[in-house]
Amino acid sequence: MTESPTTHHGAAPPDSVATPVRPWSEFRLTPAEAAAAAALAARCAQRYDETDGPEFLLDAPVIAHELPRRLRTFMARARLDAWPHALVVRGNPVDDAALGSTPVHWRTARTPGSRPLSFLLMLYAGLLGDVFGWATQQDGRVVTDVLPIKGGEHTLVSSSSRQELGWHTEDAFSPYRADYVGLLSLRNPDGVATTLAGVPLDDLDERTLDVLFQERFLIRPDDSHLQVNNSTAQQGRVEFEGIAQAADRPEPVAILTGHRAAPHLRVDGDFSAPAEGDEEAAAALGTLRKLIDASLYELVLDQGDVAFIDNRRAVHGRRAFQPRYDGRDRWLKRINITRDLHRSRKAWAGDSRVLGQR
């Protein structure tokens, strides 16, 4: 287990948070630990129908405590630290031949070869909180897929490729956004980097910081929640009306919240704007954009690596790359995790883990 000497194991933010050399906390499984975790996931794949079935959603956090103890210790401690932008677990085995080709679309990405790995990601997530999905994103799947789609190379969603995916808080528009975003790399032959950045506190003057803590900013839903990016069967769902309302009439929010020395961040580089006519807010947002652009760093997830990005402390994106469309493209499984599922209770689409935007 690798831990920074500057970690803080406490619930309250420190008066000042030292920045470690590496802005994420990393753990490497031994071969025996990796085999044990994979075997546990394989048993789940045999026992349960699907990762988002109600029985497995309830059982996963309990089964997760059968994962190797050293891994559980790392996750329990790292999630309390004040500084890491992400928790990274390396060393999970992926049988590339058994995995099969990278699908051409997320609709066909629930493949037999990737099924045990989806269960593995769910088990890891169970050590951090409860998973959920969006009714307006990839047809309400809890485990979603990140892969390039032909024709979408220059879009503003994760299925883009030739265009860089801009930095963002995941689902920044919603008060029910994830606390963690989990990514499991099934395949990344070209070493395409995930980008991350935290709050550039050292470079923000006091007045700009004051403004960013005030509800003077508008954040609209990103394009992944649009009807056009979901199946035709989803077109009439009432949840899309809520997305349209959030896009047309967003409520002013603060970009920074919480402890001033270790604030939580809520921003989307492509979908955030100042309130109309608010020049001071526009200047503050412009300053923040420039500082985040300048502080972006890269995290490459190799095959089998898992990252849990702290969606409260860091924004993330992805570098541009040349898609192959030959069955060997970059492919990740993705999941949303909340520390408090009841926070979003009124947005549940029925008795499920799928959120609708009311």
Curated annotation (Swiss-Prot):
Gene Ontology CC terms: membrane
Membrane topology label: Single-pass membrane protein
Keyword Transmembrane tagged: yes
Binding site for 2-oxoglutarate: 194, 330, 334
Catalytic activities: L-arginine + 2-oxoglutarate + O2 = (2S,3S)-hydroxyarginine + succinate + CO2
Binding residues annotated for L-arginine, in chain numbering: 156-158, 268-270, 334
Pfam families in the cross-refs: TauD (PF02668)
Segments for region (Disordered): 1-21
Pathway terms, separated by semicolons: Antibiotic biosynthesis
Positions of Fe cation binding: 168, 170, 316
Cofactor(s) this protein requires: Fe cation
EC number(s) from the headed UniProt entry: 1.14.11.41
Record keyword Metal-binding present: yes
A biological-process GO annotation: antibiotic biosynthetic process
GO molecular function annotation: 2-oxoglutarate, L-arginine oxygenase (succinate-forming) activity; 2-oxoglutarate-dependent dioxygenase activity; iron ion binding
Compartments reported by the entry: Membrane
The entry's keywords: Antibiotic biosynthesis, Iron, Membrane, Metal-binding, Oxidoreductase, Transmembrane, Transmembrane helix
UniProt cross-references to InterPro entries, sorted A to Z: Alpha-KG_dependent_hydroxylase, Arginine_beta-hydroxylase, Clavaminate_syn-like, TauD-like_sf, TauD/TfdA-like
Residues annotated as transmembrane: 117-135
Purpose: Involved in the biosynthesis of capreomycidine, an unusual amino acid used by non-ribosomal peptide synthases (NRPS) to make the tuberactinomycin class of peptide antibiotics such as viomycin and capreomycin. Catalyzes the stereospecific hydroxylation of the C3 of (2S)-arginine to generate (3S)-hydroxy-(2S)-arginine. Usually clavaminic acid synthase-like oxygenases catalyze the formation of threo diastereomers, however VioC produces the erythro diastereomer of beta-carbon-hydroxylated L-arginine.
Protein family membership: Belongs to the clavaminate synthase family.
Annotated protein name in UniProt: Alpha-ketoglutarate-dependent L-arginine hydroxylase
Lineage: Bacteria, Bacillati, Actinomycetota, Actinomycetes, Kitasatosporales
Primary gene name: vioC
